[in-house]
């Protein structure tokens, strides 16, 4: 097993422990608590995969962090903060496309990871493009503002957007939501392609031809989820 993988897991466990202490002392907000719960599930899964005990990993992570802090200076911290990049905003859609009202003949919707997925299941045999507006940090999709599916004539047939009452979402949440949307639309023999920006910043794919943003196997899996859950 790679030593860096173990070290990363140990540090993640200890940092999660610190965040948990903040939560127990009512020193954090709702989005913080939401991320804490999700990360706990992720750590349990990683621990099971690696065959490592969470308690032992947390103690080892504490030693690693303490060693780093002993050699850390305030000046180094200032440099690290100053060099952190600011998010930038990517816009596939115009203001008109984002704000336009649309209606569904056969509405279907699903909530996943703090996001609402809505689609019109009456749409069949259409060529559809996905466009999105979102922020990017470290060359990866950070926060989705809105994603909409358009036919060649410009009609809106599906949409993904954050739910205001649900705190936060992650890149994986957005990718899962897009997978559900693509699976649902392709179930009715529609042809889907994602914008280059969606492919690049959500999946790290650079395809100027706008090819599929999900492998066929994953799209079939998502389609089955739509049929049974949406």
UniProtKB/Swiss-Prot annotation:
InterPro entries: NS1, NS1A, NS1A_effect_dom-like_sf, uS15_NS1_RNA-bd_sf. Keywords: Eukaryotic host gene expression shutoff by virus, Host cytoplasm, Host gene expression shutoff by virus, Host mRNA suppression by virus, Host nucleus, Host-virus interaction, Inhibition of host innate immune response by virus, Inhibition of host interferon signaling pathway by virus, Inhibition of host PKR by virus, Inhibition of host pre-mRNA processing by virus, Inhibition of host RIG-I by virus, Inhibition of host RLR pathway by virus, Interferon antiviral system evasion, RNA-binding, Ubl conjugation, Viral immunoevasion. Residues 180-215 are annotated as: CPSF4-binding. Residues 223-230 are annotated as: PABPN1-binding. Inhibits post-transcriptional processing of cellular pre-mRNA, by binding and inhibiting two cellular proteins that are required for the 3'-end processing of cellular pre-mRNAs: the 30 kDa cleavage and polyadenylation specificity factor/CPSF4 and the poly(A)-binding protein 2/PABPN1. In turn, unprocessed 3' end pre-mRNAs accumulate in the host nucleus and are no longer exported to the cytoplasm. Cellular protein synthesis is thereby shut off very early after virus infection. Homodimer. Interacts with host TRIM25 (via coiled coil); this interaction specifically inhibits TRIM25 multimerization and TRIM25-mediated RIGI CARD ubiquitination. Interacts with human EIF2AK2/PKR, CPSF4, IVNS1ABP and PABPN1. This is Non-structural protein 1. The gene is NS.
């Amino acid at each position: 097993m790679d030593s860096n993988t173990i070290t990363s897991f140990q540090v993640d466990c200890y940092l999660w422990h610190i965040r948990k202490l903040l939560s127990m002392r009512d020193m954090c907000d709702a989005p913080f608590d939401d991320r804490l719960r999700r990360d706990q599930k992720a750590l349990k899964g990683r621990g099971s995969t690696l065959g490592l005990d969470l308690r032992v990993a947390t103690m080892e992570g504490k030693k690693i962090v303490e060693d780093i802090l002993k050699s850390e200076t305030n000046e180094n911290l200032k440099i690290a903060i100053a060099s952190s990049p600011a998010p930038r905003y990517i816009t596939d859609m115009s203001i008109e496309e984002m704000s336009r009202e649309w209606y569904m003949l056969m509405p279907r919707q699903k909530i996943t990871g703090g996001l609402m997925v809505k689609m019109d299941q009456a749409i069949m045999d259409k060529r559809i493009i996905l466009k999105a507006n979102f922020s990017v940090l470290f060359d990866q999709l950070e926060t989705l503002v809105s994603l909409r599916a358009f036919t060649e004539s410009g009609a809106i047939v599906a949409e993904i957007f954050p739910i205001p009452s649900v705190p936060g979402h992650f890149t994986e949440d957005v990718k899962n939501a897009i997978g559900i949307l693509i699976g649902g639309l392709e179930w009715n023999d529609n042809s889907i392609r994602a914008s280059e920006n969606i492919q690049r910043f959500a999946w790290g794919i650079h395809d100027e031809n706008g090819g599929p943003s999900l492998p066929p196997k994953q799209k079939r899996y998502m389609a089955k989820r739509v049929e049974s859950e949406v």
